[in-house]
């Protein structure tokens, strides 16, 4: 089950990075940048899983984790434009499969 989680995680992460890269380029050209900070509560219980989630969000263009509160499973994420929780953490269920 963990191997499937790793494969799914990598596939979704690569897709998210590519889509976000295109989005950031478009927004940079059009000047449609409206930064904000969003607080996300994670479904991941494992501290290492939370760190991987934080890294994954930061590796995705247009997003940056600025704070991680592991005891509350919360992350504060800076984004260049308003977006849904699902758009920020599409790989979260796969990380949960790996670590929980």
UniProtKB/Swiss-Prot annotation:
Subcellular localization: Cell membrane
An MF annotation (GO) of this entry: monoatomic cation transmembrane transporter activity
A GO term from the CC aspect: plasma membrane
Transmembrane domains' residue ranges: 5-25, 49-69
Pfam families in UniProt: MNHE
Domain of life: Archaea
This protein's UniProt keywords: Cell membrane, Membrane, Transmembrane, Transmembrane helix
Listed InterPro entries: Cation_antiport_E
Membrane topology of the entry: Multi-pass membrane protein
NCBIfam families: PRK06279.1
PANTHER family in the cross-refs: NA(+)/H(+) ANTIPORTER SUBUNIT E1 (PTHR34584), NA(+)_H(+) ANTIPORTER SUBUNIT E1 (PTHR34584:SF1)
Name under which the protein is recorded: Uncharacterized protein MJ0953
């Amino acid at each position: 089950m963990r191997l499937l989680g790793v494969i799914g995680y990598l596939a979704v992460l690569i897709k998210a990075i590519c889509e976000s890269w295109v989005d950031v380029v478009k927004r940079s050209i059009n000047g449609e940048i409206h930064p904000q900070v969003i607080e996300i509560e994670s479904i991941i219980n494992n501290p290492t899983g939370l760190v991987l989630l934080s890294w994954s969000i930061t590796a995705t263009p247009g997003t940056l984790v600025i704070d991680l509160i592991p005891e509350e499973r919360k992350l504060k994420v800076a984004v260049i434009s308003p977006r849904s929780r699902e758009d920020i953490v599409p790989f979260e269920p796969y990380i949960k499969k790996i670590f929980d």
